[in-house]
From Swiss-Prot:
Domain of life, per lineage: Archaea
NCBIfam families: tRNA_mod_ArcS (NF040592), unchar_dom_2 (TIGR00451)
Enzyme class, broadest EC rank: lyase
GO molecular function per UniProt: lyase activity; RNA binding
SMART domains documented for this protein: PUA (SM00359)
Record-level GO BP terms: tRNA wobble guanine modification
Enzyme Commission code(s) on record: 4.3.3.-
Protein name: Archaeosine synthase subunit alpha
A Pfam entry, by short name: DUF5591
Organism: Thermococcus kodakarensis (strain ATCC BAA-918 / JCM 12380 / KOD1)
Assembly notes: Forms a robust complex with the archaeosine synthase beta subunit RaSEA, likely an alpha(2)beta(2) heterotetrameric structure. Formation of this complex highly increases lysine transfer activity.
Stated role: Functions in the biosynthesis of archaeosine, a modified nucleoside present in the dihydrouridine loop (D-loop) of archaeal tRNAs. Catalyzes the addition of L-lysine to the cyano group of 7-cyano-7-deazaguanine (preQ0)-modified tRNAs at position 15, to generate q0kN15-tRNA, a q0N lysine adduct identified as 7-N-[(5S)-5-amino-5-carboxypentyl]formamidino-7-deazaguanosine.
């Protein structure tokens, strides 16, 4: 199986079988054929199927130790020649997984059938853990499971690629037709295969458009769906995050599950690890977010900045701004183009929103020198967040007198009067420095602290108006447009020399895309869709867009790892 696109561990892929190929997620009996279970005690030879299951022993989920041990011993004696699919019985005793994995690894199977799936789905932690271990260990293996269609979005999101539809005939026999609200509401007309096909097409569409997580959050028909997603979010956030691309479009946070999305975890980590305040800051301001994005285009932030300009004049080039929001917590002004999200606004914040935002703000405040004054122009729950952050960080925060909202005449007057107490003057050099910093911080977000300085050092130049072209010593390093960046091979070389980040190492002459089989090493920080430098003998020979995560590139044996955009 070759991966075309990721959203979380979920993959849009293609499976090639000689002259025939099909896309995943897929359905047994519709997209490809799969042999029946092949018993070790009555083994059958490979037949005329796309995937032939090797002889196996049907171990139940609660099978005792002594039976499992005896079965594994027998499975090592099987002749696996001609079989391209392995039956993996999901067991509560997960310590035996490694033995099954050794068999899969040794015989290079193309597919794994996950047995006991319908019991496993009720064991939240085991379900997520087994899928994670399979997916991380065997990136090119197609995972097949026997589940009802209302589990398809969640199962695909966590790493399953195909579904066995043969057991769905039982619902037809019972006269139950699936609906959007099954298993609580059923139709009187049997429709199992049609409904399965509709759902799988919907899942593919969601993957294509980067909206699979959104679909998952709208498919919560059972407690099992909700429980499994919660376990995945809370106990395996790194598993979800490393396969999740940086969002290019607006992310919609529509439920309590939304605030646990991997994009939120990543944002918090990057604020802590990749954001550094500008060096010339003499005053820090805290503002609330706005419904309109980017914030600077909103009426409220236009009024805030007008008040700041009125109070400080040239000193605005020495002021830094942090925006408080849910669920991202803290958005530095330079990163407002990157915070593409929308959320239900009611004025009511849950503890699950307030505490993480306050903790993130507290840690962010610690990045600023202790003598830098902090002024907060906030209302409602934002005040609670700032006060808690002040307690956690030990930093004093001055609050303006807000009445009738932060944009009322009285509130804006209070903001102006509060800021006039600070004597701050900026120079032309400060304005130029902050202009450069607005660009640098975005490159830091994508590649790490120091990337912006590598792309745009003090002797760098910025040309253009809408699309900014960045040059160092006459050579272009990249472009910048409203938070969207590109990097040239020369710019990527400077980042590689400075940070050793976002690289993929090869040992051949680069002529086209980089396939996974040709990847020697890759930076584990790479996520799908990231800009990466292709390195040979410590020289960047090309720049491209990652298809796989860095870890996945090294493990995978098939498919494109990097789509090359520019070569040296």
């Amino acid at each position: 199986m070759e991966v075309i696109k990721h959203e979380g561990p979920g993959r849009l892929g293609v499976v090639r079988l000689g002259d025939y190929s099909f896309r995943t997620p897929a359905l047994v009996g519709i997209d490809f054929t799969l042999s029946p279970f092949n018993s070790f005690f009555h083994p059958k030879e490979p037949g005329e199927y796309d995937f032939n299951l090797a002889p196996s022993i049907p171990l139940g989920f609660y099978t005792p130790d002594e039976v499992i041990q005896k079965a594994i011993g027998r499975l090592w004696s099987v002749n696996y020649d001609g079989f391209n699919a392995f039956y993996l019985p999901a067991l509560r005793r997960t310590e035996y997984l490694e033995e099954f994995f050794k068999i899969i690894d040794r015989h290079n199977f193309d597919a794994v059938y996950l047995g006991n799936s319908k019991i496993l789905i009720k064991e939240y932690r085991y379900f997520v853990r087994i899928l994670r271990e399979l997916r991380e260990r065997f990136p090119n293996v197609m995972i097949i499971a026997d589940l009802e269609p209302f589990f398809y979005p969640l199962a695909v999101y966590l790493g399953i690629d195909a579904f066995d539809t043969r057991s769905l005939k039982l619902y037809d026999f019972e006269g139950k037709g699936f609906t959007q609200f099954s298993p609580f509401l059923w139709s009187n007309e049997p429709n199992s295969l049609d409904f399965a096909r509709e759902v799988i097409l919907l899942v593919r569409k969601a993957l294509e458009e980067g909206k699979l997580r959104y679909l998952v959050e709208n498919f919560f028909p059972t407690q099992y769906n909700a429980g499994i997603l919660r376990i995945a979010d809370l106990e395996h956030p790194d598993y979800l995050e490393k396969y999740t691309p940086i969002q290019k479009e607006t992310v919609y946070f529509i439920s309590d599950a939304s605030i646990r999305r991997p994009e939120v975890k990543r944002w918090h980590e990057r604020v802590l690890e990749r954001f550094t305040p500008p060096k010339n800051v003499e005053l820090l301001l805290l503002f609330p977010c706005s419904a309109k994005k980017p914030y600077s285009f909103s009426r409220s932030h236009t009024l805030y900045r007008r008040a700041v300009k009125e109070a400080l004049g040239s000193g605005t080039s020495k002021v830094h701004e942090l925006i408080l929001t849910s669920p991202f917590g803290v958005v530095p002004r330079e990163w407002e183009w990157l915070a593409k999200y929308d959320i239900v606004v009611t004025g009511h914040w849950s503890e699950e929103e307030i505490k993480p935002a306050a903790e993130l703000l507290a840690k962010t405040l610690e990045k600023y020198p202790e003598d830098i004054p902090i002024v907060a122009h906030l209302d409602e729950a934002y005040v609670e967040i700032a006060k808690l952050a002040s307690e956690l960080s030990g930093r004093e925060i001055i609050f303006t007198d807000v009445k009738n909202g932060t944009t009322s005449h009285e509130s804006l007057r209070s903001l102006t009067e509060t800021l006039r107490e600070f004597q701050i003057e900026g120079t032309k050099e400060d304005r130029t420095y902050r202009y450069f910093e607005n660009i640098r911080k975005v490159f830091d977000f994508y590649f790490g602290v120091g990337a912006g300085e590598a792309i745009l050092p003090e002797n760098g130049q910025v040309k253009g108006s809408k699309m900014l072209r960045i040059f160092v010593e006459g050579q272009q390093t990249g472009t910048f447009t409203d938070g969207v960046i590109s990097v040239t091979p020369y710019g990527m070389q400077r980042i590689y020399d400075a940070l050793k980040s976002y690289w993929v190492k090869i040992d051949f002459e680069l002529r086209g895309d980089v396939f996974a089989v040709g990847v020697e090493e890759a930076d584990p920080r790479i996520r799908p869709d990231d800009i990466v430098g292709i390195v040979r003998d410590e020289k960047v020979v090309g720049v491209g867009k990652a298809v796989l995560s860095g870890e996945e590139m090294v493990r995978a044996k098939k498919g494109v790892a990097v789509k090359v955009r520019k070569r040296v």
